[in-house]
Amino acid sequence: MTQIRIEPLTADAFAPFGDVLAPKPAPDRMINAGRCERHHALATVERHGGEAIISIFRSDPVSLPYECALLERHPFGSQAFMPMGQGAWLSVVAPDVDGHPGTPRGFLVPSGVGVNLRAGVWHGVLTPLDHAADFLVVDREGDGVNLQEVTIPPVVFDR
């Protein structure tokens, strides 16, 4: 079974798959009479032919080492995941190789940080590490089949 070392999440390392949703070192501007920092346009919602919707997903925790054998993608829209509580989580993503997932990568997402996956990016299921977690999810709803799931030879992610 293939073993994959979990990587720290950085904007540069994650860029081929999407965006890191975290405050910038400095805000783009101050709003609300100078009481609120606005970190503007951290990601774009892709919604080819549909509407952007907001949902809450509740996911059970996983333990490391974590075995992954299922990937999915959403060809018509991006999908953003923002944890609503504290705790690190694992984001599993893979490049597309001729319509199939390539070698997966695992990123350790720190507590309070989210990610936005571009349309068509292969990814694993939600994997909070410490405890069950709720995630605010922004994605697309509309016509067309916007979910493709595939099984892959199992890979194990660990630190």
Predicted regions and their residues:
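Non-catalytic, conserved peripheral segments adjacent to functional cores
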Residues: 1-106, 130, 138-139, 143-150, ...
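Conserved metal-binding segment of the jelly-roll/cupin
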Residues: 108-124
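Ligand-binding loop in jelly-roll beta-barrel domains
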Residues: 120-136
